[in-house]
Every structure is written in C-alpha cells, then in structure tokens.
Amino acid sequence: MNFSTIEESVLKEKKKFNNFLSGFLKNSRFLIILLTAAAITAVSISVWIKSPEYQVLYNHLSNEDRGSIINELNEMKIPYQFTDSDGPILVPKDKVYEIRLRLAENNLPRGGSIGFELLDKEKFGISQYNEQINYHRALEGELARTIKKINSVKNARIHIAFSKSSLFLQDKKKSSASIILELQPGRNLNTGQINAIMHLISSSISDLPVENITIVDQSGKLLNQTSVEYDQVNDSQFKYTEEIETRYRNRIKNILEPLVGIGNIYAQVTAQIDFNAQEKTQEKYSPNSDHKNQSIRSHQIIIHNEIEKSNIQEETPIPLSNSNNHVYFNNNIKNSKNLKNNYIPVDSKINRDNTVNYELNHSVSHTKMNIGEIKRLSAAVIVNFSKDKNGKFVPLSTQKIKNIEHLIREAIGYSKARGDSVHLVNASFAKYDQKIPVHINHINTFRKSNFLYNFAPWFCSFALLFLLLKKYICPFSKNNTFQNTIPVQEKKSIDTRNIIEKNTFQVDLQNNTNTDKLIHKICNISNQNPRTIALIIRQWMSDKI
C-alpha cells in the first residue's frame, strides 16, 4: 500500500483550508460582520446573565385583581412581567414571598369578590337599609370564595334573594339563590360536587331550601336538575335497585345449586322500590272500658234540698228540733190523730247531681317511612332437567318442583300481602350437553399454587432482557477489549504494515487521482476496519516522533 500518496492528499486538503481562511480574513467586510456578531452575542449573554430570574406571583386572576396588583407593584417599584390578559404575573424570584405578604395586607387578591372586609369600611351614621345591603354583598362574596376552593371551579358568582320577615306564616316566602360557575378548561362537575355546592349554600343561609337553588355554568347549561323525573331516575336509585335484585338472585342460586348442581339454574329477580319520603302523625282516642283500671279525672256531686211546710189551722207548732229533714212539734197540739212518733211530715224535694269524668286512652304516633322500602318482588326461575340412572335428562317430579318453589319463597321472604310473585319453570337447557366445570375453585387453587404459572411472566421478561443485552451490549464490550489489547501488541513489536497487508481490503490509490473519491474510499475503509485506521495513525505518529 502506498502511504505517501495518502499523506500528500491530506496535506493538500490542509492547504486548501488554510487558503480559504486567509482569504476570509483579508476581506474586511466579513471581518466587520464577524466582530459585530460577536459583540452583540457577548452583550446579549451579559444582559441575560445579569437579568433577575422571574417566578409566578399569581395565576388565573380576574381583571379587577390584576389591575389592583399591578398598581401596587408600580407603587412598590418592583419589576413585573405578564404575557396576556389571562396569563400569570411574574416577579423576581427572590421577592415573591415578600410581595405576597405585602399584598395580603391590602387584601389582595380578592378573588373578584368582596367579602366581610366590606363591613370594616362602613361609615358612621349609615342607615339600616345600607347596612343590610352591605351584609348581603359580603355574604355573597364569602360564599363565592368558598366555592372557588373546589378544584374544577375557576370563578363563581352568587345572587341571593333573601326572604322578608312577616308576622303571618302564610305571607312568608323562602329565600332563593342563583349561582353561575366558570369551570376550568376541560373540567366538569359530577353530581356529587353539584349536590355538595347546593347543600353548602343552603346550610349557610337561613330559610333557603335546596330546591330553591339554581346552578348554571359559563355556557348557560343548567347543572342541577330539580325536576321530578330527575329525582325518580338517578344513578343512586338504579344502583340500589340493582343491588337488591342481585342480592335476592344470589340467595336463590345459593340455596338451589346444592340440589340441582352448578349451572343448572338461572334466576332473575325484579324489585319495585319505593323512594318516596313519607311522614305520618296519628292520634288515637279510645274509651276507658276497663272498670278495674279506670282512672277518674274529676268527680263532682251537687245536692239541692227544697222543704215545704204543711198548713196547720190551730195553734202554731213550736218546733223542737230539726233533724234529718224532719220537723218535730210539741205533743200538746190538738188534733193529734195524724201524729205518729211525735213528728209531723212536711213536703220536701232533693236534687242530687253526680258527675264523674274518666280519663280517655290517648296515643300519638309519628311514623317516618324509610326511603327505599321494597314494595313488591317478582322472581322467575328456570331449573334444568335432571339425569336419571340411564344418563337421560328427565323432568323433575311434581313434589320436587313444589319443594323448590317453597325454598324460593322462603329465600326471598315472600309476602302475599305485598303482592310478591314466584314463577318456576322446569325445562331442558339448550346447551345441556356442554360440560360445566363443577370444581371451579380447584382451578383457582392450581393457579395460586403453581410455580410456573406465577413466575412465567417474570421468566419471559428476564429472558428477553438477556437476549437484548447479548445482541447489543456484547459487541461493544468486545471492541473495548480489543482496544485494551492494542498496547500489548505494540509491546510485541508487531509490524503494522504486515497487519494491514493481512486484511482483505485493497485500495488502488494510484488509479484514483480525484481527491473526493479518495476521501470517500478512506471513509469506507475507516467504517469497515476502524482498527486498521487506528494502527495507521499510530504508526504515523511514531514515525514523526
């Protein structure tokens, strides 16, 4: 191989580069441009290094808060940056917390709403009407701030119509509230969050029922559905009904599968649930008919006595005494034929009123019906034919069907008064010849206990990783090992020219005078045999030294 030709070509390329560089430096125009660009770059780098690092002070501010904060920053002579009307406000990084504390002294940011700090600025001599208006504004602002703490809510406004006090209950009206929410981009509120907002507002304001709250988003969509249809059809009621039906269906399967076998029974249960909230107050009065246990509430006796004297023509009798409503006279009176036992009877009237008031049995009961009470159950069950001694499928006997139906009734708590119904059908399944695995639990036990089943994914992963390492990492390690062994070969004084001649490639440099082709071939040789090129360069360096 002719190495002198290679050296000459390399020297020619160096000369060409030197000539180009010298020509470029001689041209003053290019030199001025180069120096100007270098100066501009140096100044830009110095300014960039000396400029303070900015950090976000506040983000997602309303226009009112943004203007107030910018005015405060101008008064404090603090540099700031912001991109657009909705972008963050940037301040120097080392002053972020100091600026936040100084702005907090002025109640900034307010979140686009005024809270109870409005009451701190009331003037002396303000009227009661204005004071009430300020309180309503402050309450609306505080509730708006509270709602904005929810992650999906960007901004909120609340309008409350407070009820006026009245002496008459029939003239008193309930309060109402309207809420408009501006949601974060790509965010939505679920039903639970909407209900939470409604109950939060309802519990913060007196005489404000949940039904009088309306929530609307920024696109004008009504978020809370208060219609009767929505109350009857919601996710929680569907889930509760499905849970009840699944529970009764599992009861039927669990009690019948030991008798007919797994897979030989299909059951469906339909439940009618009463989701109406009802309260009932009942008062009962019954007479106290038990004479032994009668309790007297009051007893009143009134006696009225009237006495009329008889007409006596002769001497006036001298009354001796008056006892037991009888008048006794002297025995010397004439015409004593009508006298008996020494007294003269007179006319008398006695009126006696006896009033007894007894206690009545009085009972008051207040009953609150549970929501979700079962109104009616209906069960439909299909049982497969059973095998006889010959292996043929035959229908079940009448007695066995009755027993199965009785078990179904007991399993679901059948109530005739409630109107429950059970329908049992004994029929041959369409795929009765398909073998149904009876011992399914054995398969799960095998999966848990089998070593290969548990560690097969890990084994495959490690095997794949090993193949990748062997294919891509090992060749690099072999090249490094060869490079480490080159000094040993030099110590053994191996002639590099002989090593080059042993290689299988040959380059015809004499026939290729074109420099581009020569460089192209040298590049190909270096890509195919980097070891040979390394040895050539080392040989050149050793020769020059």
Swiss-Prot record:
Cellular location(s):
Cell membrane; Bacterial flagellum basal body
Q: Which GO terms describe its cellular component?
A: bacterial-type flagellum basal body, MS ring; plasma membrane
Q: Which residues form the signal peptide?
A: none
Q: Which domain of life is it from?
A: Bacteria
The record's disulfide annotation reads: none
Membrane-traversing stretches: 30-50, 449-469
User: How does the record say this protein sits in the membrane?
Assistant: Multi-pass membrane protein
Whom does it interact with, and what assembly results? The basal body constitutes a major portion of the flagellar organelle and consists of four rings (L,P,S, and M) mounted on a central rod. The M ring is integral to the inner membrane of the cell and may be connected to the flagellar rod via the S ring. The S (supramembrane ring) lies just distal to the M ring. The L and P rings lie in the outer membrane and the periplasmic space, respectively.
**Cited NCBIfam families:** fliF
Q: What does this protein do?
A: The M ring may be actively involved in energy transduction.
Family, according to the entry, reads as follows: Belongs to the FliF family.
Q: Per its record, how is this protein called by name? A: Flagellar M-ring protein
Question: What species is this protein from?
Answer: Buchnera aphidicola subsp. Acyrthosiphon pisum (strain APS)
What gene codes for this chain? fliF
